[in-house]
Structure formats: structure tokens, C-alpha cells
């Protein structure tokens, strides 16, 4: 066998399969990105109609957390990591430590969404709504969509305050979804959403404070 043949990269089904797999994964990522943006737009533009569609979707809690929340929850820590590097904030900490913090933030964010869903379900009786674990997790996951997407502003730290508008959007979206998914009375939906948001904010502060102690 000649030296040229030895240096020739393999041209077989395995190589082609890897290329096809990469293309398939890229296409799937694009579809998922389009779905997330479409859902966020629908929840802000026509929340009642979008919540009705969400209610009809046949899914599971793990699928919501892994398939929808996990990719979204990665946006804030990844953008913060990039923003820190661009603005030289990484000089104050080791890159490895910054990466660990980003991963912990991501995991805690997913856990916080699940906790929020549990809270929505637990408080249902207080606000004359119906308990439903799956619908409560849908409320938590999709209401937090604007908050996760606002993480892109971490790319330029001086714009962090814009993320506060995402909190207002979260309350608005949740308030419109509670009557649809949890059958909450219209006149109690806003106080329901506000109570859940405040409790989740407190829990988030505690969880992220504990997470920061780990690193």
C-alpha cells in the first residue's frame, strides 16, 4: 500500500453517517430555536390562544424540562460567560471556576422551574383553581420563556436592567395562562400569578446564593 493511500482520509459509510448525523442535529436545533421563538412571540402577542394550544399538547413533565426548559435555561449563563470574557471580568476569577458557575446556574435554573410548577399546583386551592401537575409545569416553563431569553442582554452587562421587563412579561403571561390551564377565576388570576412570582423570586435568591457558595 502506498504512502498516499495511507494518508487518504477514510471514505466509507461511517464518515457519511457522521456528516448526516451532524446535519440532522443542526436541523433539529434550528427547528427547536424556531419553536421557542414562535412560542415566546405567541405568548406575548396572543397569550390566550397560545395557552389553549399549550393545554392541548400531549407531553410529560420530563419532556418539558429536558426538551424545552434545559436549552432555554442555558442562555443566561452562557451569555454571561461570554459577556464576562468580552468585558474582561474573567480576569478576576479562573476560567474553570467561571465555567463551573455557569453549569451550576444552569442546573439550578432548571430546578427552579420545576419548583415553580410545584408551587403553582400547591397554591391552586388557595385561589379556587384546579390542581393539575402537568399543567402547572407548563405554566412554569412557558411563563419563564421571556426571562430566559432576556439572558442575551448579559452579553453586554450594562444592559442587565432590561431583564427587569422580562419579569413583568412573566407575570402577564402567567396571569393569562392560569385561567386556561388551572381553571383559576379571572378575578383571582393576577393575585395568583403575583404570589407565585414573589415566592419563586425568594426561592431563586436562596438557591442561587447557596449555589454561589459551592464555587
Where are each of the predicted segments found?
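Transmembrane helix-loop junctions and nearby membrane-interface residues
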Residues: 80-88, 155-158, 181, 212
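Hydrophobic alpha-helical transmembrane segments and adjacent short intramembrane/lumenal linkers
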Residues: 120-205
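Short hydrophobic/aromatic-rich motifs at helix boundaries and adjacent loops
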Residues: 20-24, 91-95, 146-150
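Selected alpha-helical membrane-embedding segments in polytopic membrane proteins
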Residues: 2, 28-128
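A generic structural micro-environment signature
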Residues: 7, 50, 60, 71, ...
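Juxtamembrane boundary at the C-terminal end of a transmembrane helix
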Residues: 203-215
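A general structural signal for short secondary-structure boundary/capping elements
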Residues: 71, 183-188, 212-214
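Short, non-transmembrane cytosolic segments of multipass membrane proteins
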Residues: 2-37
Amino acid at each position: 500500500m502506498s504512502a498516499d493511500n495511507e494518508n487518504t482520509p477514510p471514505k466509507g459509510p461511517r464518515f457519511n453517517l457522521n456528516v448526516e448525523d451532524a446535519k440532522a442535529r443542526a436541523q433539529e436545533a434550528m427547528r427547536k430555536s424556531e419553536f421557542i421563538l414562535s412560542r415566546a412571540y405567541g405568548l406575548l402577542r396572543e397569550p390566550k390562544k397560545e395557552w389553549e394550544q399549550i393545554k392541548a399538547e400531549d407531553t410529560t413533565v420530563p419532556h418539558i424540562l429536558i426538551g424545552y426548559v434545559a436549552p432555554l435555561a442555558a442562555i443566561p449563563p452562557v451569555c454571561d460567560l461570554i459577556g464576562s470574557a468580552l468585558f474582561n471580568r474573567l480576569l478576576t476569577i479562573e476560567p474553570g471556576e467561571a465555567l463551573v458557575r455557569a453549569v451550576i446556574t444552569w442546573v439550578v435554573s432548571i430546578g427552579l422551574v420545576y419548583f415553580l410548577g410545584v408551587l403553582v399546583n400547591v397554591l391552586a386551592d388557595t385561589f379556587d383553581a384546579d390542581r393539575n401537575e402537568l399543567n402547572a409545569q407548563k405554566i412554569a416553563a412557558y411563563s419563564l420563556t421571556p426571562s430566559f431569553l432576556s439572558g442575551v442582554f448579559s452579553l453586554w452587562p450594562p444592559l442587565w436592567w432590561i431583564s427587569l421587563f422580562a419579569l413583568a412579561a412573566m407575570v402577564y403571561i402567567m396571569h393569562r395562562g392560569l385561567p386556561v390551564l388551572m381553571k383559576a377565576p379571572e378575578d383571582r388570576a393576577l393575585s395568583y400569578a403575583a404570589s407565585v412570582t414573589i415566592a419563586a423570586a425568594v426561592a431563586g435568591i436562596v438557591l442561587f446564593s447557596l449555589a454561589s457558595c459551592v464555587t
